[in-house]
Swiss-Prot record:
Biased composition (Basic and acidic residues): 290-299, 512-522, 552-564, 650-665, 708-753, 899-909, 929-947, 1067-1080
Comp. bias intervals (Acidic residues): 151-165, 276-289, 300-310, 541-551, 565-574
SMART domains for the chain: ARID (SM01014), BRIGHT (SM00501), CHROMO (SM00298), TUDOR (SM00333)
Region (DNA-binding): 4-121
PANTHER family associated with the record: AT-RICH INTERACTIVE DOMAIN-CONTAINING PROTEIN 4A, RBP-RELATED
Biased composition (Low complexity): 690-702, 1230-1252
Annotated ARID domain residues: 309-401
Designated gene of the protein: Arid4a
Region feature Disordered, mapped onto this chain: 142-169, 273-310, 435-470, 498-582, 633-768, 842-953, 1067-1173, 1216-1261
Phenotype reported upon loss of the gene: Viable and fertile, although females have reduced fertility. At two months of age, animals show abnormal blood cell production accompanied by mild anemia, leukopenia and thrombocytopenia. Hematologic abnormalities become progressively more severe with age. Monocytosis is observed at 5 months onwards, along with splenomegaly and hepatomegaly. Approximately 12% of animals develop acute myeloid leukemia (AML) and/or myeloid sarcoma. Mortality increases rapidly from age 6 months onwards, with no survival past 22 months.
Protein name, per record: AT-rich interactive domain-containing protein 4A
Location(s), subcellular: Nucleus
GO function terms (MF aspect): double-stranded DNA binding
Length: 1261
């Protein structure tokens, strides 16, 4: 920055413009460390010499005549040809900040410090982010500090000097020897010095007849004529002369032990001070922050590598003093690749390669660069490290070699550098050998330098010791252990199932706790298998092959889990990722762009892999850490892709499993869906198993596919024990029934059974109910254990945990009511409760599953499985009627007592979740539910509630009406609880009031349904507040459906539901859709049919039904619909009764659907909340025979279910949208969703606002 007329150096107090972070700021010079190099032309012999300003007398300006002391000590006249200011200036800025800068970073105030040609007006328009024009134009004569042009003569001189450089090395006879240098003509004027290689100091010209020496007195370097140098034999000098002449003592000590005198060393404090004060003024000032970060990282790493800090300090002291004495002080820490350069380590690495002169290959320099631990940023790495070495260390290397100065860490056991020519590997081995000899305690105190051991070996050691690697190994081992344990648990679970069956027959004499443990332990992964196995029981050949497939799938899932667990750590060890070319998504929404980038490194953060990516063509300051979901991996990069897939593996695996399940279902669609197989048995076992095992299984089901299988299987979810019991009880009836037989065949057979074996059915059901009670208790315990396991397990996140919690709560709630109902009402009630519980558990698990996928699958399944469900319903209905009639005769007298007991149970269950309502119904209802199991369980509650409602109608009061007046959107969990309580009270009053025997069955049905509803409520609560509200409403509606129907007729929902009970049911269903998007398969299937018949579906529900839910009775295909049906089976049953009674008890679902649709369309435009489309007289049912009544009620139930399924699907859709919105938006959309779902017509009728209310409203008179 110095102009021709500027002084040679600046003085303290001068106002200057100082460069700070790339910009020039006003400052004042505080201190000066003066060092001016003067190139003079000797008049005597017309030669040039480079001397320091303290060797010159006269004005320091170019062209001035001065006196100078030559290398031989004589004083001659000379002309200054060039001045170089190498001083260090400490300046103070306006804000008090201090910086130590070279003269090149300073300029006098008022001087131009920008390039005129580079004003912004003349610059092309470029991205300012990439604007990199320097403030000052680069000097043409870079590296030369003089502002004057270089003359041709000087260039020639320089070239000739370079040619002579090799010759200087030949003067080896005196190298490393202590000599006496004659300072003047007098013989007495001499001083001791050490002859060193001329290569040590490029600034001092050493001619052929001269030698370069370092004085022991002032430690400076001088070029001395050979004639003035005499070899000194200090050992022969007398002690008196050693003491008398300065420097001789130091020379003697050096000669004897090669101990460097103190004046040849710089105080380590000065080194640290200069490095800290000049830390930020390195050439790349723009990257100061980066350098600081890198320096910190290096300091963290150094303790691992530096084994001899004392020797390092000794090295640095000599190096810094050497550089200062030769006129090139190191005033700031050298930087390479934005990291502080470890000169000690660099010196050692080059020494092990035989010295700088022996390294010809750029690859070796590149290796040294990497060994320093500096990231290679560009292709100039080898050149940069070589240049840095030549600048800072080459002279010192020559000095040490010529003076035979060694450092124990570097030259250990090695006499001379020249003799050192070792291969890189040998040096590595030696370094490793030497490392143990160094004091290990010094490692921590090492801030700057590194040791012999190469960074590579250090890195290898650290990698071996790294906790990540260990963690990965442990995780792999854990995965293997988990698989083994799971297989063992599977076997135990199967055995336990067999034992449970025996225990169920023996009234639970076995050890239920152990069974629960096994079932719960195996629950998460075995549940799906068990359900599938249950479904497949009738088909032994298929079952075997399917089981094998499922086992293999389970193993794959466990492996994938293990992989995903250890995957994060794998990324660190996978070298293939570094440098991988990828595409990265940048930005969000419409502004998102994709940039090409390369991965620079990977890192783990809270179990998530982060990638440091560099965008091609962008400055490194745009490098950023991104998550895997923003990276688009190239096709050829399997590793990264797999990693990405593994992260999403839960979803993909579940989707694959679902697809497989669907394919299996399709292959079996020739036959009725597996549900039909159990439908005949459903009356007995469906309720039992579904409640007891089905729920725990579904709740614990690990994958979405498993959940879907459970839903599709509906009644199939029965535990093996229940299945066996069902088969035993119904073998006589159902063995003959084929899944493929039409509904009519099933109905006729069931009618025959009912007529021939009414008493048998009751007894069987009673026994089954006892078993169910045991099983259910076991299931509750299992569910609790399962919850604990789920919480512990890494996968127990989100869906699973929610499902488990719901199922547990449901199970807990239902056991009380079920036990009471079982003891008071009969085994049938228990079976009903279990079925409902199972359905609810299914719905909860289904809710956990992706609503979309579930809906699709359910739709498909329903298309193929409608007939089986219908068959089941018809059969169940027939059996139910027979059971009801028997119960009426048997239980008519004790109906009121039962009612009182039920009411008590109601209150108990209210605290638990409404299962008590279920306990109220009588055995008749129990039979109906057990017979109908899947959906029949839901239908039965409706039938009995209607009857009960007839009896209890006068008892229904404003409380029940108030309970029903609940807005789906407005319901809060608190409101839900209160509503549930009110409904329960109303239902209790209804059940108490109803005296006829029909009431007990109705109550029982409601109870079974209610418990499932309660389960679903719990599940939905865990999932969402909305779903919780709906579920609670469902459970309340179902429990109190007996009274609800009456209440509904009296009151309608405020929002859009015409009848409180129906609206509550709709709410429950909607909430279930949201929370449990899929209810149990059986219930959902029945509901789907009924809903289709019901014209009041919401548009979404109608669509799902059209897709297949409506066509098929299977609830699997209607995920949302299923959930709604599960939640509202009782309500739906009640509604269909009301509708069907006015029409004709014997109407079949298709006709009823059309009629209902027509009615809906008619009623929709003008229907008021109290216009009940589903209302009918219970006495009409009394006029029908058992078969007609069952078929009639089933049809009604199916229609109602369809409607609710549609509502459910719509609610699920709304729920999904709400997830994306903020809380406010969610609440608003929730209200809109519930309203729209209640009022919208899915396609059954054009006007849907009022019809849904009508559909929901059930008038029982």
């Amino acid at each position: 920055m110095k102009a021709a007329d500027e002084p040679a150096y600046l003085t303290v107090g001068t106002d200057v413009s100082a460069k700070y972070r790339g910009a020039f700021c006003e400052a004042k010079i505080k201190t000066v460390k003066r060092l001016v190099k003067v190139k003079v032309l000797l008049k005597q012999d017309n030669t040039t010499q480079l001397v320091q300003d303290d060797q010159v007398k006269g004005p320091l300006r170019v062209g001035a005549i001065v006196e100078t002391r030559t290398s031989d000590g004589s004083i001659q006249e000379a002309i200054i040809s060039k001045l170089t200011d190498a001083s260090w200036y400490t300046v103070v800025f306006d804000d008090g900040d201090e910086r130590t800068l070279r003269r090149t970073s300073l300029c006098l105030k008022g001087e131009r410090h920008f390039a005129e040609s580079e004003t912004l007006d003349q610059l092309p328009l470029t991205n300012p982010e990439h604007f990199g024009t320097p403030v000052i134009a680069k000097k043409t004569n870079r590296g030369r500090r003089s502002s004057l042009p270089i003359t041709e003569d000087e260039k020639e001189e320089e070239s000739s000097e370079e040619e002579d450089e090799d010759k200087r090395r030949l003067n080896d006879e005196l190298l490393g020897k202590v000599v006496s240098v004659a300072s003047t003509a007098e013989s007495t004027g001499w001083y001791p010095a050490l002859v060193v290689s001329p290569s040590c100091n490029d600034d001092v010209t050493v001619k052929k007849d001269q030698c370069l020496v370092r004085s022991f007195i002032d430690s400076k370097f001088y070029s001395i004529a050979r004639k003035d140098i005499k070899e000194l034999d200090i050992l022969t000098l007398p002690e008196s002369e050693l003491c008398a002449r300065p420097g001789l003592r130091r020379a003697s000590v050096f000669l004897k032990g090669r101990i460097v005198p103190d004046n040849w060393k710089m105080d380590i404090s000065e080194i640290l001070e200069s490095s800290s004060s000049d830390d930020e003024e390195c050439p790349a000032e723009e990257h100061e922050e980066e350098k600081e970060k890198e320096a910190k990282k290096e300091e963290e790493e150094l303790p691992e590598e530096e084994l001899d800090p004392e020797e390092r300090d000794n090295f640095l002291q000599q190096l810094y003093k050497f550089m200062e004495d030769r006129g090139t002080p190191i005033n700031k820490p050298p930087v390479l690749g934005y990291k502080d350069l470890n000169l000690f380590k660099l010196f050692r690495l080059v020494y092990h390669q035989g010295g700088c002169g022996n390294i010809d290959s750029g690859a070796v320099w590149k290796q040294i660069y990497m060994d320093l631990g500096i990231p290679i940023l560009n292709s100039a790495a080898s050149y940069n490290v070589k240049t840095a070495y030549r600048k800072y260390l080459y002279g010192f290397e020559e000095y040490c070699r010529s003076a035979n100065i060694q450092f124990r860490t570097i030259h250990h056991h090695e006499p001379k550098v020249k003799e050192e020519k070792k291969d890189f590997e040998d040096s590595m081995d030696e370094a490793l050998k030497e490392a143990p000899e160094m004091p290990l305690l010094d490692v921590k105190s090492e801030p700057e330098e590194n040791t012999d051991s190469n960074s590579e070996s250090d890195r290898e050691d650290t990698e071996l010791k790294s906790p990540r690697g260990r963690r990965k190994i442990v995780r792999d081992a854990n995965c293997i252990k988990k698989e083994i344990e799971e297989e063992k648990i599977e076997d135990k679970f199967l055995r336990d199932d067999l034992e449970n069956k025996d225990a169920g027959d023996d009234d639970d004499d076995g050890d239920p706790a152990a069974k629960r443990e096994h079932e719960l332990l195996f629950g998460r992964k075995s549940t799906p298998k068990n359900k599938e196995k249950k479904i497949k029981k009738p088909e032994d050949s298929e079952r075997d092959s399917d089981e094998e497939e499922e086992k293999s799938q389970e193993r794959e899932e466990t492996e994938s889990r293990c992989d995903s667990e250890g995957e994060d750590e794998e990324d660190d060890t996978e070298p293939c990722l570094t440098g991988t070319k990828v595409k990265v998504k940048y930005g969000r929404g419409k502004t998102q762009k994709i940039y090409e980038a390369s991965i620079k490194s990977t890192e783990m953060d809270d179990g998530e892999i982060l990638y440091l990516v560099h965008y091609y063509g962008w400055n490194v300051r745009y490098d950023e850490w991104v998550k895997a979901d923003r990276i688009i991996w190239p096709l050829d990069k399997g590793g990264p892709k797999k990693k990405q897939k593994k992260k999403v593996k839960n979803k993909e695996d579940s989707e694959k499993d679902e697809k497989r399940d669907e394919e299996r279902q399709k292959s079996k669609r020739g036959r009725p869906p597996l549900k039909s197989t159990f439908s005949p048995n459903m009356p007995y076992s469906l309720s039992k198993t579904s409640n007891s095992e089905g729920k725990s299984d579904s709740c614990s089901s690990d994958s979405e596919a498993d959940d879907q299988l459970e839903k599709s299987s509906g009644g199939e979810d029965l535990s093996p024990d229940v299945k066996e019991e069902l088969e035993k009880n119904e073998n006589a009836h159902d063995d003959k029934l084929d899944e493929e037989n039409p509904k009519i065949v099933h109905i006729s057979k069931e009618n025959d059974r009912t007529q021939a074996q009414p008493s048998d059915t009751l007894t069987v059901e009673a026994g089954d109910s006892d078993q169910i009670v045991h099983i259910f208790g076991d299931k509750v315990d299992q569910v609790e254990e399962f919850k604990k396991q789920v919480e512990k397990s890494p996968k127990g996140k989100g869906r699973r945990s929610k499902t488990k919690d719901l199922s547990l709560e449901l199970i807990k709630i239902s056991p009380f009511g079920q036990e009471e109902a079982g003891s008071e009402a009969h085994g049938d009630v228990h079976s009903l409760e279990f079925s409902s519980l199972e359905c609810k558990n299914f719905s909860s698990t289904e809710d956990d599953i992706d609503p979309y996928e579930k809906e699709k699958k359910l739709k498909r399944k329903i298309l193929g499985q409608q007939s089986p469900e219908k068959k089941l319903r018809l059969d169940n209905g027939m059996e139910m009627t027979t059971g009801v009639s028997q119960e009426r005769s048997d239980d008519g007298a004790g109906a009121e007592g039962m009612k009182g007991a039920h009411v008590e149970q109601h209150f108990e269950t209210e605290g638990e979740g409404m299962p008590s309502l279920t306990a109220e119904p009588d055995q008749g209802l129990q039979e109906l539910t057990s017979e109908k199991s899947d959906s029949p369980a839901e239908e039965e509650p409706v039938h009995t509630p209607l009857k009960e409602e007839e009896d209890a109608m006068p008892l229904i009061g404003p409380e029940t009406l108030v309970c029903h007046e609940v807005d789906l959107d407005d319901l809060d969990e608190k409101d839900k609880t209160s509503i549930e309580d009110v409904v329960v009270e109303g239902s209790e009053s209804n059940s108490l009031a109803s005296v006829p025997p029909a009431l007990p069955p109705v109550a029982q049905h409601n109870f079974s349904v209610a418990s499932p509803l309660t389960l679903s409520q719990d599940e939905s609560r865990s999932i969402k507040s909305e779903s919780d509200i709906t579920i609670e409403v469902d459970s309340i509606a179902e429990e109190s459906q007996e009274g609800l129907c009456e209440r509904e007729s009296a009151n309608g929902f405020e929002a859009s539901v015409a009848s409180g009970a129906c609206s509550i049911i709709a709410h429950e269903r909607e909430s279930r859709e949201k929370g449990q998007k899929r209810p149990s398969d059986g219930n959902s299937g029945l509901i789907a049919k009924k809903q289709k018949r019901t014209p009041k579906r919401t548009s979404a529900a109608a669509k799902t039904e059209k897709n297949g839910a409506g066509q098929s009775s299977d609830s699997e295909d209607l995920p949302a619909m299923d959930s709604s049906s599960n939640c509202t089976p009782v309500k739906r049953l009640t509604l269909p009764k009301s509708q069907k009674l006015p029409r004709s008890p014997a109407r079949t679902s298709p006709h009823i659907k059309d009629a209902e649709k027509e009615k809906h369309r008619e009623k929709h435009p003008n229907s008021s909340p109290r216009t009940y489309k589903w209302s009918f007289q219970l006495n009409e049912l009394d006029n029908m025979n058992s078969t007609e009544r069952i078929s009639f009620l089933q049809e009604k139930l199916q229609e109602i279910r369809k409607y609710y399924m549609s509502l459910k699907s719509e609610v699920a859709t709304i729920d999904r949208r709400r997830k994306r919105l903020k809380k406010k938006d969610r609440e608003v959309s929730h209200a809109g969703a519930s309203m729209s779902s209640a009022s919208s017509d899915t396609g059954m009728s054009p006007s849907s606002s009022s019809p849904p209310q009508n559909v929901l409203a059930v008038e029982c008179r």
